[in-house]
Amino acid sequence: MAEDGMLLNFSLDDSVIKPQQRFKGGTWKDRLVAKKIAVKRQNKSRHSAETGAVNSNNPQNPNKINVPTGQRPAKRQRIDGGDFKPTTKSSAGGGGVGNDEQTDRKSYGDRQVISSLFTYNPTAKTVASTDGATHDEDTTEPAKPSNAPLVDGIDTFTSLGLSPSLATHLLTKLNLKTPTAIQKSSITQLLKEECDAFVQAQTGSGKTLAYLLPIVERLMRISSHNKGKKDSEGNTVHRDSGLFAIVLAPTRELCKQISVVLDGLLRCAHWIVAGTVIGGEKKKSEKARLRKGLNILVATPGRLADHLENTKVLDVSNVRWLVLDEGDRLMDLGFEEEIQGIIKKLDERRRPSKIPDLPAKRTTILCSATLKMNVQRLGEISLKEAIHIKADPADEDDEQKDGSKQPEFSAPAQLKQSYAVVAAKLRLVTLTALLKRTFARKGSVMKAIIFVSCADSVDFHFEVFTRRESSEELPDADDENAPSSSNVHGSIATASAFSNPSNNVILHKLHGSLPQHVRTATLSAFAKQKDASVLICTDVAARGLDLPNVDFVIEYDPAFCSDDHLHRIGRTARLGRDGRALIFLLPGNEEGYVDILKGSYREGSSNSVTRNEVNEILKRGFGGNSEAISKGWEDKATDWQLDIERWALEDSTILEMARRAYQSHIRAYATHIAAERHMFNIKDLHLGHLAKSFALRDRPAKINVPGLRPGNEDTKKSFKADRKLASGEKRKMSAREDSSSTTDAAEARKKMQQKLKEHMAGASEFNIA
């Protein structure tokens, strides 16, 4: 047949005989995902073949354009290498908030992000007034002081009922000529009647002397009446006569200050002995002082409750005066249970005294600047049929007539308050510029206090402001402006960031995490400092402390409640002196805090709260007075910020300190009271911009601190890696994880060796020191 010699030649494509790819191993979900990816890749290559597109990776690509080397397009600036100054918002094409948000959402891995100080900052909601003055301009008439001593010359300490010897001592030794309004009301009432009292007055009005003078006067009278009696009868007042008065204060610093004031008063009555028992001190030394005998005891509630429970030599049977100073702070710190126990033990151990003229009942005095619910609760616990003592009794009558409720606590009338709306990225440079301008001239400002929210922030800013550049020379040993010898504690140093050749500024730091002897030495050094000095601290220094010559208070972080704000600014403008206070606020909801600032003055007062412009502060701090000098203030501020960031990157200790300060600041920001949380909402914080103010270049998710939980991103990565490890795949560890695991292993090995040494030592098992 003709068909027998026919030969058919079929041309088959390679894809027909290509073996199918099969996926093995892993979970069914992983195999399904891999299969979908392979199918998608095949469909894409088939579509490219049909449309005639050529792969760009092919060296024979006809669509390839060769660009000459001299006309290469401009490359984007690198993010991870070197410092650069980004273009400003006005010069960047198409820049806006939307672009900024997209940039922030980009993943740069472990690379550093260097952002500009003056771009993409939120604008303030409120409009600044055209007649606003800066903090160093005196444009308003000084108000009449509301907490100054009386100047009419009629009321003197002698006319209030004090003995001539005590009044003369106040005049000659303490330089106190006339009493304040609260001292006049309190001394007269407490000497006239033996009843409980609630003393309420402005901060800085002399409440300490208002309750100490009546107690010292009564003890001096009892001593003079029994002067001819023999000591063996126990009727003469001396250190062995017993404990007559107890003063409770919330903080150790306030106890130390009350003790200093009391020692100054008792120089005219040396036979009356006072002492202190506070936390942080050696209990053995305190027991020795109690064993020798004390007549007046200043204590913190926790330590006094401990001594009442465990110290048998502490005899409180003759206690006739109990003072609760800063009652609102005592309740805020949670001392209600201790105070209840102290009052209960005083009632149980009270005995009739053999000393004539000693009151038969105990008088309790509660002192507080505010009349909040917790203070009323403390009054219910400690006071019985108490009288209310105010600086001006007419205020209470006017309030009853008008039916209007005045603020519970008002700022001194002569205090000038101001605020500055500062973007988060500009906080650090603005504070530096403000301090540079404040201490530009010697003698303009003697002392200033900076309040921050947490102890880690205090440590970080102290290191920033006291860092010494390589070009700077160390101060001479005989230099009068050099830091004192207490600098061995690391809490006092020269503020190189805002000092100048004509005005050397000494910086002090104070917070509750420091050892007690360091806190005491630092506070004493700041109080005795005669040159320009700055104290950066937490709220541990916001209550009751009378620090002399404080002219300026800066609230770098707003207080957690309005009452704490009033106590902070009360460190200045004391006893009729002038003072200024400035608070930093973020743009947005925090600007509503200005209404609280305005409401801190008494109704009808002519005082106003002024606004300081950020650009003006930066221009005056990094520029100068003249227009020609102050042109490059933006570049100077940027250079200073970048220098701080490089310094933090080079020193791992400083970098960890900055990260801890950043984390602690965010945690502290979330603790504002509920009534003010709409102004201080943590969800409104721009964490990336806030990290810039702590000299950090890491993204917020990458700012990890040892001992804290990892961020969401790291948690997800570790979860996925563990899941792959469970499925049989080999986990690839990053450099960070490798280093951390190595560190953990080294620490574990070190702890194991330490435990072995302890077990090898025979006496360690019975070491009870």
Curated annotation (Swiss-Prot):
ATP binds at A201, Q202, T203, G204, S205, G206, K207, T208. It holds the Pfam family CTE_SPB4. Signal peptide: none annotated. One of its GO terms (biological process) is rRNA processing. Keywords: ATP-binding, Helicase, Hydrolase, Nucleotide-binding, Nucleus, Ribosome biogenesis, RNA-binding, rRNA processing. Residues 472-481 have a biased composition (Acidic residues). Its EC number is 3.6.4.13. A motif (Q motif) lies at residues 155-184. The Q motif is unique to and characteristic of the DEAD box family of RNA helicases and controls ATP binding and hydrolysis. Belongs to the DEAD box helicase family. DDX31/DBP7 subfamily. This is ATP-dependent RNA helicase DBP7. The lineage of its organism: Eukaryota, Fungi, Dikarya, Ascomycota, Pezizomycotina. The gene is DBP7.
